[in-house]
Amino acid sequence: MEQQLKTDGLNLSIRDAVKEDRISELPEDLLLQILSDIPTENVIATSVLSKRWRSLWKMVPNLTFDFTFDPKYHQTFSENLYRSLTSHEASVLESLQLNFTRGIDGLNIGMWIATAYVRHVRKLVLVSFGDVRDKRARFRSALFNFNDTLDILEIQDYILLDLPSPVCLKSLRELRLYEVHFKDEASVCNLLCGCPSLEVLSVHRERNVDVETFTIVVPSLQRLTIYDFCIGGGKGGYVINAPSLKYLNIVGFEGLDFCLIENAPELVEAEISDVSHIANENILESLTSVKRLSLESPIKIKFPTGKVFDQLVYLDVLTKEREWWNLLSRMLESSPKLQILKLTGLSCIEKGLDGQNWNPPKCVPECLLFHLEKFLWTGYEWQRGDEKEVATYILENARLLKKATFSTKRIDLENLEKRREMLNELASVARASDSCHLVFHSI
């Protein structure tokens, strides 16, 4: 007699129940995509489901192993990881992520990475978890040698790179370093010089005291992001030599000794945030070739004397700092081809600044007379006299302005009428451009 299953009061035969296994009927590519989002140890367990699933896990292109728990599972973790890598049958291993703690020794990690290289891994992510009391996992040059398929390398947290000789990652295109320590300045150099195809570099540092001079010399580099949050206690600094660099993002430099951009003639776009109190820097001076520029801390870095931003068409200035408008004036005077001006306000603007007067440029800047077409002000503080002065000046002098947009923060009902009056005053300003469309809205 055929065994019966009872579901919701209905009799259903095992044969019919098996037919309801619709997931096994999905295309293999879709199944592999689904399995790629599941921890690899769980993926391996699917091999017992049916004959079709027996070998399917071996084709999964993205593998993630997490050893951040009890060290007593070390042996099982190692066996599963090694089994997965040696049994992998896809032509290319798209990605391998290893999350580990101090319970994993460097020899095992080296063996796993070497096996991944044999499987032509394209993306490798190494994450070491711990706290300030833990000894960092030490990686040496041999771990990153003789690979010609790796495209992306990401190294995170409690890892020390001790690289006495150059690495050899010929095809590496993107490198991400998050709170990684280096043994010395030579280790930084030996990592970067061993990546001749590197185009994208992200460096995140916090409370790092590993190297004083972080030198970035990469001829092929096109995009660079540096986050450094050594607030008030930073020593040393950065030297950047990247002749092919097109995009630069610097965040959090405060109290460093220097930041020198020695060679970056191809820069197109730059974003500078929270940069202040650097004894020796040439940041703005090195950005005169950019077409798009965002500045968050305008008054705390040197303005280049006699320099002209003659390629700049887009400028974004944050209005939170004291007398931010002084830098705005200088940027308008130095950017003859500027087409789009954006001012961004924050709720953390310093109190007690109202009543200070803005001194506009002595002569109307060339960009206002001949090029500026769009003016955006996000977080416009309608109650502040200095901001009204700046807005009025732009409207009265930008002859080709097509659209001016002012976004104000939401306010209490009791202040709605006062805000309406202030915005109506701004709307009544005699605009230099007859075709300028004025827009107000809340954010």
Swiss-Prot record:
Domain F-box: 20-68
Keywords: Leucine-rich repeat, Repeat
FBD domain sequence ranges: 357-408
Top-rank taxon, per record: Eukaryota
Residue stretches of each LRR repeat: 74-100, 152-179, 180-205, 218-252, 272-297, 320-345
InterPro entries hit by this protein: F-box-like_dom_sf (IPR036047), F-box_AtFBL13-like (IPR053781), F-box_dom (IPR001810), FBD (IPR006566), FBL13/AtMIF1-like (IPR050232), LRR_dom_sf (IPR032675), LRR_FXL15/At3g58940/PEG3-like (IPR055411)
Manganese listed as a keyword: no
The keyword Repeat belongs to this UniProt entry's keyword annotation: yes
Protein name: Putative F-box/FBD/LRR-repeat protein At3g49030
Taxon lineage: Eukaryota, Viridiplantae, Streptophyta, Embryophyta, Tracheophyta
